Amino acid sequence: MGAPPGYRPSAWVHLLHQLPRADFQLRPVPSAFAPQEREYQQALLLVAALAGLGLGLSLIFIAVYLIRFCCCRPPEPPGAKSPPPGGGCVTWNCIAALLVGCAGIGVGFYGNSETSDGVSQLSSALLHANHTLTAIDHLVLEMVERLNEAVRTELTTLEEVLTQRTELVAAARGARRQAETVAQQLQGLAFWRGVPLSPLQVAEDVSFVEEYRWLAYVLLLLLELLVCLFTLLGLARQSKWLVIVMTVMSLLVLVLSWGSMGLEAATAVGLSDFCSSPDSYILNLTQEETGLGSDILNYYFLCNQAVSNPFQQRLTLSQRALANIHSQLQGLEREAVPQFPSAQKPVLSLEETLNVTEGNFHQLVALLHCRGLHKDYGSALRGLCEDTLEGLLFLLLFSLLSAGALATVLCSLPRAWALFPPSDDYEDTDDDDPFNPQESKRFVQWQSSI
């Protein structure tokens, strides 16, 4: 099948499409995009389940590490105030992990923006295609109404005026038959009229889902950013309660990161299968939803010299009929108007209607050509298979960096918390120190008493 203009499957599409797939019984599953097949659905669920497996392993590792830290920690000698060896290394490991998490957040914001741009391009292509299809229906309806009105009024009046000349009446009736032929042929060109599938509705649904997806990822990114910043603040101020709260929040964000990773991985794999060969699936789905013939769908989705225009015969007959009407009106204007002056007004009105109809007909021919809709199809594929897929991969990288950084933080924070000095140590500060909290409190009380 011919590829849409400007679209070629990317290297990421080929790489993800070649990954092996298996169902729940670990039997191989073809990589062809078939979301309606149960085995293919199981294969995507299994890809998402790998993230759940990673979450379980990371939680087990964190639990074992913390249990070992709590149970196997050597007792501190009484009266010891100096931190044990390696304490600074633990703190710096935690800070490094938080910085990696912050870098992952930047990657996540970029990936979220790329995904949103790709979906926006898809929606714009659908809206433009809907505009083209609506314009075709509108032009056909307008031309048919004009021709029917001309048959009912001007041509009927012209036949009544020319009753004394049978050959002129025959010419007027010939123009009537030609106008009826054009109207009949034009009605068959509005191929999208009555089709239940609306590109406008699809674009609105896609935009609605994308708004909530974008917002959900922004909230997740902001939540992780706040966790990283407040954790750094807790380490800097050696605040035990803040570190405890951030430990709980880090565990929550860790679960969310692994969950988003599974969703992103399954979506990226399924999207790569679709983008590797989109024509066949789109053709079959559109034919099922619209009931249109395969000749029309092949013409617009493929748009190459091997596929003929299914409307060419109707367009040719309509153009010939319009040319015949034009020649007949010229003959009537030349023969009938000098003998029947009252025939001039309907003849001029018919010529005006014919000129407007011919202009609309040329515009309709341009809209019916496959170039416009095929260009929209290619734009939609580029948005979905390039920008959106690239954004998903960046979001997948963000989730991976986030999961690794938060797992490291969860292992490091309890050890860093254990190194914080007890609250009694803060009471040993110099009474003359202006930054001493007790001294500051006494200073405020002294000012209020003045």
From Swiss-Prot:
Keywords attached to this entry: Cell adhesion, Cell membrane, Chloride, Chloride channel, Disulfide bond, Glycoprotein, Ion channel, Ion transport, Membrane, Phosphoprotein, Transmembrane, Transmembrane helix, Transport
Any Gene Ontology CC annotation: chloride channel complex
Modifications made to the protein after synthesis: N-glycosylated. Contains high-mannose, hybrid and complex oligosaccharides.
CDD domains, per the entry: Tweety_N
Catalysed reactions, as listed in the record: chloride(in) = chloride(out); L-glutamate(out) = L-glutamate(in)
Domain of life: Eukaryota
Record site feature (Essential for the formation of the channel-pore), residues: 165
Chain ranges passing through the membrane: 44-64, 89-109, 215-235, 241-261, 391-411
Disordered: region residues: 427-450
Entry protein name: Protein tweety homolog 1
Phylogenetic lineage: Eukaryota, Metazoa, Chordata, Craniata, Vertebrata
Encoding gene per record: TTYH1
